[in-house]
Amino acid sequence: DDDYHYPSVKLEFLTAFSGADGYLRSVVTDEGETLPVVEDKTKTNIEANALVRVISNYASEVTADGTAGAVLYALSGVLSVVPQTVDKFEEGVKTDPTDVLGIWMGLDYLNMTLIVKENGEHKFHFIEDEVIVDTATGCSEVYLTLYHDAKEEVVSYTRRAYASVPLRQYAAEGIQKVMVHFSVHTYSGDIKTYDFVYNPD
């Protein structure tokens, strides 16, 4: 039927919220739009009344009462943990190489798509190297490094990994601007540092 229009499906990082039954009830886009979940085709179930960071193929759909909602077609969890200082890593800090396919600011998060060698288990976290707060100017600087434990570095092909650094904890009272410096050890042997400005509302 020529009149059929396929839904306009987007692939984006979202923050998803569950209801009392653990099923996803709403999502917030990185543009700050809150959308009720009209249908979750993945039937994802998480802890009750919780939030989780995801990457999802979804489409906007007008709900019965005329408001905008979301239909979730596919969904994957995104590593999103609050950065820790070096002393909190009991087995020491690991910075095995990773390549960054993309890195950008979202809403209260620094998002990234990483390329890793496909060799079984990879452990990621975020290392908080230093935080400098200047209350006089209302600015702070945050230095972070990607923690990556690649286990056995065998061969072969690569895959993508998705991560999202929560930044809200750096928006202390009186802080209007946070300079974020995020460093990654790459396969070429270099350390790449990405600089972003986070303006908490």
Residue map of PLM features:
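Short helix-loop boundary/capping segments
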Residues: 101-153
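Short, solvent-exposed, Trp/other aromatic-anchored flexible loops in extracytoplasmic proteins
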Residues: 149-179, 185-187
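Short nucleic-acid-contacting surface segments enriched for D/E, G, S/T with interspersed K/R
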Residues: 41-56
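Bacterial Sec-dependent N-terminal signal peptides
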Residues: 1-20
